[in-house]
Every structure is written in C-alpha cells, then in structure tokens.
Swiss-Prot record:
One of its GO terms (cellular component) is membrane. Its EC number is 1.-.-.-. GO terms for molecular function: heme binding; iron ion binding; oxidoreductase activity, acting on paired donors, with incorporation or reduction of molecular oxygen; steroid hydroxylase activity. PANTHER family: 24-HYDROXYCHOLESTEROL 7-ALPHA-HYDROXYLASE, CYTOCHROME P450 FAMILY 7. It is found in: Membrane. This is Cytochrome P450 monooxygenase fsoE. It comes from Humicola fuscoatra. Pfam families: p450. Pathway: Secondary metabolite biosynthesis; terpenoid biosynthesis. The keyword Metal-binding applies. It is a single-pass membrane protein. The chain crosses the membrane at residues 28-48.
Length: 578
C-alpha cells in the first residue's frame, strides 16, 4: 500500500515539476473565466438595452409608439434557444411575465427573433387583426418542403398570389364544408368508421374475456387514425397502405425536428418517416386518379369511396387549378392536411378517455350522458349517437373545454405586412417583417384569468377539473373565470350549464378572430364521438394509479400527447340495441 501511494505521489510530483498539471488547471480556469466574462457582458448589455427600452416607453406621451424591450440573455448569438428547448412553456410563460402580461417582449431563438404577445387585450388585437395587417410567416413554405416533403423546385407554387391564393381558398372551402349539412354527413361517416374499427378489432378475445394491453393510447390512436382517414379520404388510402397508422404516428413523433429545420444529414430517421408517409399518399393519389374521374363526380355529393369527403375532392381540384400537378408536391399538401386533422384531435380524445377512466365517479356520470345520447341502432352501425346531444351536453362540453385548456400548447406566429407595421394596445409598435408569437398555453394557464377553486376546494390549473367550465346559477364561485363576468338571478332553474362567457381571448386552443380554426366543429365531434364509442364498446380498467403527464417535447405544435404508456385491461361490452 505504501509503495502504491509513493508511486502515485511520484507521478503527481512529476506532472507538477513538468508544469503539465498546473498548465491544464490554468487553461481550465482561463476558459471558465472567459466564458463567465462573455456571459456577464452579454447579460449586462442586453439588460442595459432592455432598461433603455422600458425607460423610453415610460417617457412616451399619448399617441407615441413604443418599442418593446428585449428579454436579457447571458448567451450571445443563440440567445434564449437553450432555455426554450429545455422547457418551451416554462420559458415562454416566464418571458411573457418578465415585464408583465400585456407588454410584448423580444426573445432570440438563435436565428428566429420574435416578440411575445400576451395578455387578453394584446391577444385580442393580435388575433382579431381587424386591419388585416398580419400574415402567416414565409416559413410556411419551408414547412411544406422540410416537414411534408414538397420538392424544392415546386415549393414556390404554394406561395400566396393575388389571383389564386390557394391557402385562402382551401380555408374558405373548409369553413363551408365543415358546417351545416357537410359537418353532419362527415360526423356521421366518422362515427360509423370508428364504431366499425372498435367493434371489429382483433386485439382481444370474445365478449367478457379480459385482455391486457401494454398501452391504451397506442390502441386508440391506431384505430382512430384509420377511421378518420376513411371518413375524410375514403377506404382506399388505408387499404393500399396496411401500416398507415404506425407510419403516421412515427412521422408525427419526428415532425418537430423538421419544422425546426434540422438538416437532413442530422435527421435521417425523420426524413425516412416523412418519405414513407408521402409514398403512402402518392400510392392513393395514383390509384384514385386511375379508377375515378374526379370531374364526373357531382358537386353536391358529400362522400364517395375514391376521394372520400367533398372537401378532399375540392382540395384536389384547387391543386389542379393552381397547376400543382407534381405527385410529390400534391402528396405534401395532402400529408399536411392529414397531419393537421389528426395530430391534435386524436391525442385530445385520448386525454378525454384517460381522465374519464381515471375517476370512477366521473366515469359513471359520463356513461349516463352517453347512454342518453344513444340513437337507434342500424345494420351499418349498432352503436349510434346523436351528435347534437353529445356536443351540447353541459358536462361533456366542460370536459372538452378543460382538456383543450390543459393540453393544447400551440405557437401562433404572424408578421406585419403593412408598411407601417403593427401596433398593439399600449402603443407597442412592431415593424414590418418582424415576427410576433403568441403561446396559447400561456393564456390557457394564466392564474389571473382562470378559476382555480378556493382554499377549501382547490382545483390547480395544472390539473384536470371536469366542472371548471360549468356554471351553477346559485354559486357565484363557479364557472371558468377567476372573476366571473355574468349576472346572477336570471336563471330559471338550478341546473349547471356550460359557459365560455368572458373567455373569448383567453380560451384560445383554436386561435381566434379571422384565423379561427375552421375545423374546430369537426374536431369537437371527433373527440366526443371517439370517447363515446370506446367507452360504450369496451369495459376498460387502467392498470396504473397515476396518469402520465403531457409530452412537452411537442410544445408549440398543438395538443401535447401523454408522455408515457398507459397499461390497461380491456374487454368487449355487450352492445344493447336502442
């Protein structure tokens, strides 16, 4: 032992004598000191800039425009990007509150500087955009190329033009066809497809036989993705691509990296997943074109088997009208729509199911509401629901609103197009081509807005409360808002009712104003019908006492899915005809 110790001391002495250990230590200390100095200087400089902006804003007189302050940063060049990547919601919420909600603040996410919009008044002005001074940023074209696979040489065809603005035309078509009779037909088709998928599944045994599943979420998302695709695109897209559901969810897990512009050579698995999906879509496009003349289908046909819904046909015709004929470019646009219609509604439906099953008392109430909405069984679908009853039920609506409040985390990004820029309440001025970002989650989790219960009966905003959006006429503390904006005494009975009164610019999972999501009504039908069918078709017992949290890795892109598996045991229920 002594010889070993002597040997170690000899080696150490030799290193010191030769100056090696001291030189390494000095180099390390020098690197730490330089890094610290650079960080401190950058923090000091950005704080000084910010203080000047705040002081100038305070000196501004009535009618004078003010420039927003910058959030201080210790890291030069890349700014706040690491804070954003480590926790998007926490960072955006902290940044929005740095000078107080309602004061726009500049952040720097590497090559993407942006001004955060927060607070009800500023969010209202931002979403209303009454002067039509804001537009989606040009990055949307990059998304078509990198996230959805449009060949670079055809991306320009999706650029807005005065004569044929394809995005506006598709938005208008979607608004028209996902309302009234169009919505009714599509919702009916959707529930038939979901019921068929649920009742014909081969993953479990006969009635009354329990089957253990490693993950309820995967079971639901695969069946619902295929059903939704059949409803919107007809049966052939699924039939031609047996692995479509798994291909889509693999793509969905990787799409964020492509949205953020990670180079192909650093992101091969994501590119492969995207290309697999575009190949699937192209296979359907070619099959449909070969077997059906789209121009011969009457305009008033709401659904047919080759193209599915009327809206899908209209979109294909608009692509042709815009002279977008390349199959890969068309596949990219179709993939973008498939992603938009499933990436948010399916995880929301799963959360609705999980929260219901996690609370036996709530499950009992929900099952009673679902039974009341059952309609006469048919040969085509033995499990029918009155969609209007589902979507107008007070408890189910409250649960729907709460799921979206708690789980949606989208970033709404716009740029001023007017030469004068864009002004927010308070006189804050944003110059042309500067970027504005609004985090829906910051507004949906604002403790100054939402009712979180009281000391005797707390309901924290980061936990699910099924009745948060229910108003009890005889209880002034009920309802979604911390400070209710309603009058009492006018109710004719004591029954609770669903309310979004006063929530217009705070409950913003679908955006708002002229950019309000046109598919919101169908999304509501999807979420409630999915939950109704799975709860009615199966008896499900969760094999975990604690639900997973939301996957904040997808922050900024819509609904955050569960961040873990949910094991369960499941068996078929006997379907009793109504």
């Amino acid at each position: 032992m002594n010889s070993t110790l002597t040997s170690k001391m000899t080696v150490q002495d030799a290193l010191v004598d030769n100056g090696l250990l001291g030189k390494g230590t000095r180099s390390l200390l020098m690197a730490v000191a330089i890094t610290y100095a650079i960080s401190w200087i950058n923090w000091f400089f950005t704080s000084w800039q910010s203080s000047r902006a705040v002081a100038a804003a305070k000196r501004a007189g009535p009618g004078q425009l003010k420039r927003p302050p910058t959030l201080p940063s210790a890291v030069p060049v890349v700014g706040h990007i690491f804070q954003f990547l480590l926790g998007g919601h926490a960072f955006m919420s902290r940044a929005a509150k740095h000078y107080g909600l309602g004061v726009p603040v500049r952040i720097n996410l590497a090559t993407f500087p942006s001004y955060i919009v927060s607070g009800r008044d500023c969010v209202a002005a931002f979403l209303k955009d009454q002067g039509r001074q804001l537009s989606r940023i040009p990055r949307g074209l990059n998304y078509m190329e990198h996230a959805f696979g449009c060949p670079h040489e055809f991306v320009h065809q999706f650029k807005p033009r005065d004569d044929v603005d394809i995005e506006h035309q598709m938005h208008t078509a979607l608004q028209t066809m996902l309302a009234g009779n169009g919505l009714e037909v599509l919702a009916g088709r959707y529930q038939t497809e979901v019921a068929h998928a649920a009742l014909s599944t081969s993953l479990m045994g006969k009635e009354h036989e329990w089957t253990e599943l490693p993950d309820l979420c995967s079971f639901v998302e695969d069946h619902v993705l295929e059903a939704a695709t059949r409803a919107l695109y007809g049966p052939h897209l699924v039939a031609l691509n047996p692995t479509l559901a798994r291909d889509f969810w693999t793509f969905n897990r990787r799409v964020k990296s492509m949205f953020m512009g990670v180079p192909k050579w650093l992101n091969p698995s994501a590119v492969r997943a995207r290309d697999k999906m575009t190949d699937n879509v192209k296979r359907w496009q070619l099959y449909a074109a070969e077997h059906c003349n789209i121009d011969e289908i009457p305009d008033d046909v709401e659904w047919e088997p080759f193209y599915g819904s009327r809206y899908t046909r209209v979109r294909q015709k608009l692509l042709t009208k815009r002279d977008i004929m390349n199959e890969s470019a068309r596949a990219a646009e179709n993939l973008a729509f498939i992603w938009a219609t499933n990436a948010n509604s399916v995880p929301s439906a799963i959360w609705f199911l999980l929260e219901t099953l996690h609370d036996p008392s709530l499950e009992k109430q929900v099952r009673a509401r679902l039974q009341a909405a059952r309609t006469e069984s048919t040969d085509e679908n033995p499990l029918n629901f009155d969609v209007n009853k589902l979507t107008s039920d007070s408890l189910l609506q409250s649960m729907f609103a709460e799921i979206l409040r708690l789980r949606v985390a989208a970033l709404v990004v716009r740029q001023p197009t007017d030469a004068k820029g864009f002004s927010l309440p308070g006189g804050w001025h944003i110059k042309p081509k500067e970027t504005l970002s609004m985090s829906t989650r910051t507004e949906l989790m604002d403790p100054g807005v939402w009712n979180a219960g009281d000391a005797a009966n707390p309901h924290p905003l980061d936990s699910f409360w099924a009745e948060r959006f229910l108003v009890y006429p005889d209880d002034p503390r009920s309802g979604p808002l911390r400070e209710p904006k309603r009058r009492f005494g006018a109710a004719t009975n004591s029954e609770p009712y669903f309310s979004l009164d006063g929530c217009t610019w705070s409950w913003v999972p679908f955006g708002g104003g002229r950019q309000l999501c046109p598919g919101r009504h169908f999304a509501k039908c999807e979420i409630l019908l999915t939950s109704a069918i799975f709860l009615s078709a199966f008896e499900i017992e969760l094999l975990t006492d604690k639900l997973p949290g939301p996957d904040e890795g997808v922050y900024g892109f819509g609904t955050m899915p569960p961040n873990g598996k949910v094991p369960c045991r499941i068996r078929r229920r006997k379907i009793v005809s109504v």
